């Protein structure tokens, strides 16, 4: 459904227009009060050739999350430490998120998990950095259950202490594949619905990877969400489960900014909680993404499956941001289906639109930052990766 007044596409729950507009008003009242979390996490699933567009090769994908976080915080800067990996097409969605976060005057909180290095910029310390990335999901042993529970409990505590609404975003190369594995572990047949940062989703490759992981995991009939994340998930999922539950226990609204990775979080939470009325929990939870990710309806279909399976009414919102008239190929590539989403681009740009900023303003600032990135050599050349 499309809201002409707001330029926003609604998907998922077919609630009436009045209810949708009421929900939007909730967000509009709190725009400048949101706390944005960017969870940057490592999984060795990202090292599989052809699995992700978040970097042109396996080596560059190890740096992607750090470079995204740095750019989200600082934008184009001569003092950058991490070069943004060269992509086959497009440019990091951190560009969009940085521009829009500055417009609405929100300073994101970075949560590094499983990266193996300590970022030089301000960040939230949740676990020992020496733990490193989770294993490739094909092993069926991504992480120890102890690590999963620790990450969940840390997220839960942070969420429960929240005094303001939160937005959860991510930069997890390989994360759509772990998301698919988690959903399929719970019986959802989603191989043809889970999206990708790549122009053409590597569905056959992902199907083989997920099947191998689930076979090796050998999950029994009495498994729970922790078991699934430990088997085929990633650190982002464990932490974000807790963060979402904690924030809702604190009666805060939550925007899950992304696509299939955020739906995997919802699924894990709904499987984990013994709720008498799931709708009370979901009431002020929103999935927010970019218009590019919902173009082919796959994400909407995926959301419908979850709404039906768990008898909830989760609402999806798609940002109206577009680069149709941009003068730069890297931005126009988004219109062709490249990159699509990441680093909270959908949710953060949605908040900027709800705060009254126009598409032309956002595009202009994205172009200015892109120009500076090029001048400052902030995008790596392939030979540097």
UniProtKB/Swiss-Prot annotation:
Top-level taxon in the UniProt lineage: Bacteria
CDD domains reported in the protein's UniProt record: DMB-PRT_CobT
Family that this chain belongs to: Belongs to the UPF0284 family.
UniProt GO MF annotations: nicotinate-nucleotide-dimethylbenzimidazole phosphoribosyltransferase activity
InterPro entries on file: Nict_dMeBzImd_PRibTrfase, Nict_dMeBzImd_PRibTrfase_arc, Nict_dMeBzImd_PRibTrfase_sf
Lineage: Bacteria, Bacillati, Cyanobacteriota, Cyanophyceae, Synechococcales
One family name in Pfam for this protein: DBI_PRT
Native species: Prochlorococcus marinus (strain MIT 9215)
Protein name listed in UniProt: UPF0284 protein P9215_05181
């Amino acid at each position: 459904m499309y809201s002409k007044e707001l330029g926003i596409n609604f998907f998922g729950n077919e609630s009436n227009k009045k209810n949708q507009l009421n929900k939007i008003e909730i967000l509009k009242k709190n725009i400048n009060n949101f706390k944005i979390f960017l969870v940057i996490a490592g999984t060795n699933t990202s090292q599989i050739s052809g699995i992700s567009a978040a970097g042109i090769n396996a080596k560059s994908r190890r740096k992607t999350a750090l470079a995204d976080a740095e750019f989200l915080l600082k934008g184009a800067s001569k003092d950058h430490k991490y070069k943004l990996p060269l992509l086959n097409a497009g440019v990091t969605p951190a560009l969009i998120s940085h521009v829009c976060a500055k417009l609405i005057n929100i300073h994101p909180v970075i949560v590094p998990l499983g990266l193996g290095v300590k970022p030089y910029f301000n960040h939230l310390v949740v676990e020992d950095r020496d733990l490193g990335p989770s294993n490739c999901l094909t092993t069926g042993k991504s992480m120890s259950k102890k690590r999963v529970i620790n990450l969940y409990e840390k997220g839960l505590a942070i969420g429960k202490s929240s005094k303001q609404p939160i937005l959860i975003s991510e930069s997890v190369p390989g994360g759509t594949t772990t998301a698919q594995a988690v959903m399929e572990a719970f019986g959802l047949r989603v191989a043809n619905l889970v999206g990708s940062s790549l122009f053409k989703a590597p569905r056959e490759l992902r199907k083989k990877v997920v099947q191998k992981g689930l076979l090796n995991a050998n999950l029994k009939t009495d498994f729970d969400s922790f078991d699934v994340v430990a088997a085929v998930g990633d650190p982002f999922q464990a932490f974000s489960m807790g963060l979402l539950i904690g924030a809702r226990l604190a009666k805060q609204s939550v925007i899950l900014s992304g696509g299939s990775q955020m739906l995997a979080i919802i699924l894990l939470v709904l499987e984990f909680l013994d709720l008498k009325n799931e709708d009370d929990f979901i009431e002020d939870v929103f999935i927010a993404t970019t218009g590019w990710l919902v173009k082919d309806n796959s994400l909407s279909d995926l959301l419908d499956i979850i709404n039906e399976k768990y008898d909830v009414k989760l609402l999806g919102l798609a940002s109206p941001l577009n680069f149709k008239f941009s003068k730069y190929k890297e931005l126009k590539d988004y219109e062709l289906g490249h990159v699509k989403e990441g680093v909270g681009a959908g949710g953060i740009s949605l908040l900027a639109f709800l705060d009254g900023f126009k598409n032309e303003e956002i595009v202009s600032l994205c172009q200015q930052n892109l120009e500076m990135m090029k001048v400052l050599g902030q995008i790596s050349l392939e030979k540097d990766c």
